[in-house]
Amino acid sequence: MFLVKKIAVRIRGIDTPELNDKREEIRNIAIKAKEELEKLFNSGNKIILYNLGRDKYFRLLASVKVGDIDVAEYMIKKGLAKSYDGGAKVW
């Protein structure tokens, strides 16, 4: 028997725009970011979480790889995320 529970994990080192942002151009980037992450996570490659910790709000935080792809670097290169160190929001 398997017990399955969804757990939200924030990707270490990046900030993506909010889907409910008032600015349409930012919302469009947020939608593209969500779609790109879904595509990446559903690719069938192994998902690896490492460097686990908690952010300042105690949310689960991890570095993430899908296959050989570092997800944070990938999203930044695609222009769908910005580098983030836990300080002020960057969008």
Outline where the language-model segments fall.
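Small beta-barrel nucleic-acid-binding modules, primarily SNase/OB-fold domains
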Residues: 1-91
